[in-house]
Each structure stands twice: as C-alpha cells, then as structure tokens.
Amino acid sequence: MSEEKKQWSISDIEAIYQQPFNDLLYQAHTIHRTYHDPNSLQFATLLSIKTGACPEDCGYCSQSGHYKTHVEKEKLMSVEEVLQCAKEAKEGGAKRFCMGAAWRCPPDKAIPQLKEMIEGVKSLGLETCMTLGMLTKEQASHLKEAGLDYYNHNIDTSPSYYDKVVTTRKFSDRLDTLNNVRSAGINVCCGGILGLGETREDRIEFLLTLANMETPPESVPINRLIPVEGTPLAQAERVEGIELVRTIATARILMPKSAIRLTAGRTEMSDELQALCYFAGANSVFIGDKLLTEDNPQRFKDKTLFNKLGLTEMV
C-alpha cells in the first residue's frame, strides 16, 4: 500500500502532531526534502472576480451577505478585466492564477463567461484555479472542458466543528463538490482555516479528513484566520504560531506529495514564523497585495524575506 493510500486513524495523527516539536519538524522536513525542493516555492495569485453578497453565513467571511463588513458588493468581472489582472500577475512572477467568486454555487448562465476566463488565462501560459462555491457534475465538466487545472473548495475545519462555523450548508455538501471536481478530472485544492475557535482535536480531525480522501488534494491551503470586523469571528483568538507550524508539519507528513500553501494570515506573521512554516513543509504562497478582500504581504517584503531564506521560485 502506498503512502497516499494509507488510512490514518485519529490516534496515528495524534501521535505525529503531539510529538516533541523538534522531532515533528525533523520528520516533516525529511519527508519534505524527499518529495520536493526545500528551497523553492510555488507562486500563485488570487483575484476576486465577483465580490460580496454571498448567501452563505460562514462566520469568518467578509463576503457573506449576512454580515455588515468593509466589503462592497461587485458584480462578476468581464473577461477582459480578468485577463488584464492575469497579465499583471504573470509579470509579478505568478505561475498559477486563481479566480474566486462569492457564490453559493455559480449560476449556469455564468459558465460560458467563466470558461472564457479559463481559456484566456491559460493562453497566457498560467495554470488556472477557480473557487466558485458548490459545483454540480455538469458544471465541473464544463470547467474541465475549458482547461481548468485546479478547483479550490476548502473543508474549512473538522466535520465535528463545521456547523459551529457555517449553518447554511452541510459538511457533506463540501465533499459532494470535491467528488464532482475529482470525477471531472480537475486537480483538487482543499484545506482550511486555523483560529475559528476549534480545538487541537478539531485540527487533527481536519487533517485526518484530508489525508484519508481516496486521492489527497494536490494542493492544501492552510489559512490563519484574519478576523474581520462585523463577522461573528471578529474577536476570535488567534491560533498560536507553534500550533500553526505543527499543523503544517503534520500535513506534510500525511500528504507528502501535496503542495502545502501558506495562505491567509501571513501579514501578521514574523519572518521567523514564516521561516519555520517553510521548513515544516509549506512550499506554496500567494503573492500580490490582496487575498480576495484582505491584505497580503507586499511584493517587496516577500522578495526580501525569500532572499534572506534563500528561497527561489519553483520551476
């Protein structure tokens, strides 16, 4: 049985996650070096192509129509606008261009326009990723026809804690969409958010869910919550840095071939904490000044840090 086909148990993951920190880092970094270049990062850019007024009630999200936040509603961008942003992203060093829309599920009438975006971005030589909410099998097939490389659909947290964060959909709805994406032949990008009020046990169950998928996600984004004023989680306690590193290291051990993306929350991290995350197995980041609606480290800050650490762009 291959590493990716192993069925992990909670006790397996507890033993990994809770071992002495130095032992955990050593194990994770050893695996990381086996499967990846430890001194290279994948650069991606994320663009909000349709912003705000989402009917879902995710307790962390600035784009939910249930809460009054700083986000202003914006309609779906034109293909031309998206392609201009993609060109700028490529000039800035991005290799993958991710497009996010604040929908529960995309309206069928938008699919032709979305397909044009995919085709246009691919023609620039960029990998494509979309996150549009729940997808039917038919919609996933249409996106695949256009050449979509990745679809992001995060499970956010553990199955046990999920309904404390979102009530307008079920955890099983997330899994259904992931199955539709996988069946269409699109690579899966799936991770979650730390700092939603979950326990360590929830984080372990969250990792168990990802690692025990029939095929683990090719890309696993790990977000550190950016509290947004106006949302139910605006005052959530920030997850400790060491806990973040433990989560990344455990993800690397459980899913050795996956890209582990250090995503939201980097603006609040010290250089030293980011360095630990990369040592533990994170090998992908979003570059640019925005992550959908929230700030991201400015390019020059990223460049300075990556130069200090000797990290280069993944070829």
From Swiss-Prot:
The Radical SAM core domain is annotated at 39-266
Q: Which domain of life is it from?
A: Bacteria
Pathway-wise, it operates in: Cofactor biosynthesis; biotin biosynthesis; biotin from 7,8-diaminononanoate: step 2/2
Q: Which InterPro entries match?
A: Aldolase_TIM (IPR013785), BATS_dom (IPR010722), Biotin_synth/BioAB (IPR002684), Biotin_synthase (IPR024177), Elp3/MiaA/NifB-like_rSAM (IPR006638), rSAM (IPR007197)
Return one Gene Ontology term, BP aspect.
Answer: biotin biosynthetic process
Concerning Gene3D superfamilies, the annotation shows: Aldolase class I
The chemistry this enzyme catalyses reads: (4R,5S)-dethiobiotin + (sulfur carrier)-SH + 2 reduced [2Fe-2S]-[ferredoxin] + 2 S-adenosyl-L-methionine = (sulfur carrier)-H + biotin + 2 5'-deoxyadenosine + 2 L-methionine + 2 oxidized [2Fe-2S]-[ferredoxin]
Q: Where does [2Fe-2S] cluster bind?
A: 98, 129, 189, 261
Q: Does the keyword Transferase apply?
A: yes
Instruction: Give the cofactors, semicolon-separated.
Output: [4Fe-4S] cluster; [2Fe-2S] cluster
Q: What's one GO MF term for it?
A: iron ion binding
Q: Does the keyword Transferase apply?
A: yes
Report the cofactor remark: Binds 1 [4Fe-4S] cluster. The cluster is coordinated with 3 cysteines and an exchangeable S-adenosyl-L-methionine. Binds 1 [2Fe-2S] cluster. The cluster is coordinated with 3 cysteines and 1 arginine.
Cite the entry's keywords alphabetically: 2Fe-2S, 4Fe-4S, Biotin biosynthesis, Iron, Iron-sulfur, Metal-binding, S-adenosyl-L-methionine, Transferase
Give, as one word, the top-level EC class: transferase
| Assigned EC number | 2.8.1.6
Residues where [4Fe-4S] cluster binds: 54, 58, 61
Biological function: Catalyzes the conversion of dethiobiotin (DTB) to biotin by the insertion of a sulfur atom into dethiobiotin via a radical-based mechanism.
Concerning its family, UniProt says:
Belongs to the radical SAM superfamily. Biotin synthase family.
The record's annotation in NCBIfam families points to: bioB (TIGR00433)
Protein name (Swiss-Prot/TrEMBL): Biotin synthase
Q: Which gene underlies this protein?
A: bioB
